[in-house]
Amino acid sequence: MRVILLVFVLSAFSSGVKAQQDPQFTHNMFNHAFVNPGSYGLSEGITVTGIFREQWVGFKDYKTNEKVSPETFLVTADAPVRFLRGGIGIGIAQDKEAQIKNMLVKLGYSYHLNLGNAKLGIGLNANLNNKSIDKDKLNPVDESDPVLMGLSAEGIMITDMAVGAFFQKPRYYIAFSSTQILETKKTAADSDGVTFFKNRRHYYLTGGHDIVLPAFQGYVFTPSVFIKSDMNTLQADINLMARYNNKVWGGLSYRINDAVSLMVGVAYKDLEIGYSYDIPTSQIAATGSHEIMARYRFKIERDKTRTGYRNTRYL
């Protein structure tokens, strides 16, 4: 178990490890506001989304029997602001892996361009990230390691930025964004300037298309892709959702070389609730992952003479 904890520590606090730093979600088609500031305010209302993920259920320290499986929780909210010619958004996330905890806050703006029956959002956000580790629960080989000595109980605070562009039409969308673009570094106070954490720039490419087939009355099929990379590793999700009368949905997702996911959900008026279960296909995990998503949209009245742009229901 000490080896596993060492992997967690190095993943979060070493600039030499290649694992991606941004949290992972199966409900990526509902999570544009967290990874792409260009999507802020593109839906017709104030949209609040929450996602909770428990990864590798039942993963415990074999000595203490304490749960060490990663847990991630986030809440995002975005809304159109007419006098700003765009939208604003905020996101709060907490990612916990064994003794390591990350707290992230994002705040940003998106400028909207009307392109016929399409719309393009170009946005940016600033983010503040607090990374902390419970050193009392570690059993390091070398307690004088400068990385560990430089860590305070309050953790380290890192600022960075993200940019993104989100293009949508009534039945499809395509988007590109980059997070942690400044690649901020942090050094330990007692380690002679040795860098023990560095943000790595992440890139996102997403797209989806609503398909209506005459043979399936009331159904809307939405294939989509979600690609994330830090130029060292690549995550690619291929999704297919089927929605019936905008009330219930189900779907499948394949995360290449990692997991197959089953998704179900219901919608009642402006409330949507979804659940997914990841079945691992890699050798890293023997147990699956649970994820719950909830979203509520507060409608905003617009001038009837103004053209509306409502894309896919996943904004």
Predicted regions mapped to residue ranges:
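Sec/Tat signal peptide C-region and signal peptidase I cleavage site
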Residues: 15-19
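Positively charged n-region of N-terminal signal peptides that target proteins for export
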Residues: 1-4, 115
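Sec-dependent N-terminal signal peptides
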Residues: 3-13
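Subset of outer-membrane beta-barrel
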Residues: 20-315
